[in-house]
Each structure stands twice: as structure tokens, then as C-alpha cells.
Amino acid sequence: MTILQRADQRLPTSMRPITFETKFYPYAEGSCMVSFGGTQVLCVATIEDNVPPHLRGKGKGWVTGEYSMLPRSSPDRIKRERDKIGGRTHEIQRLIGRVLRSVVNMDGWGERTIIVDC
């Protein structure tokens, strides 16, 4: 069995270094640049004073996520999704929202929505 050499010389069992830089973006209610070795993910949170129609009048909040790759986040430029998002992007957004809702208590902050852009 051949073991491939990683570009950064890590062993196959070694994790990439992980760092979090908070307050990365000055205009949002919250932001963080997360780095996993050479992979960087910018997450920005926005709070809006509304909820989806199915939650109106129930006093509960909502958390959702939006996702998009930057055009030069890969060796070849990725075209921006304009009018309609693709299936992969849609599924990643659904996954982000579901994961966030599974770990956030939405009962204590009224009818507000937190939108996390990644």
C-alpha cells in the first residue's frame, strides 16, 4: 500500500492546524474567519427582526445559513450563481441551517432570525 505525501508534509493521521479569528468583518453582528490549514471559511452573522411565516406569533427565533464559494477559491475561477442556485449549493445551505438549528436554543430571543453567511 502506497502512502501519498501531503503537500504540507503532514502525516495521514495528523490534523491541519485550526484557528479562529473573531470580529473579522466590522459591519455584521458577528463574524469569524476559520482556518483549517490552507482552507479558510468566512462566516458572518446577521440578525433580523422577523421569522419565517410558519413561526410568526409563536415567540420563537430562527437560524438559517447561506453558502457560496468565492470565484477564486479554487484553481479555476468558479462562476457566481446568479438567478438560481445549484443543487450542491442548495444542499450545503440546508445542511448549514439544520446543523445550526440543532445546537441553538431558539426559544429565548423572540421572533428574530439569525442568518449565517458562509
Task: List PLM regions with ranges.
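Generic structural motif
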Residues: 18-22, 78, 116
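Short, Gly/Pro- and small/polar-rich lid/capping loops
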Residues: 1-26
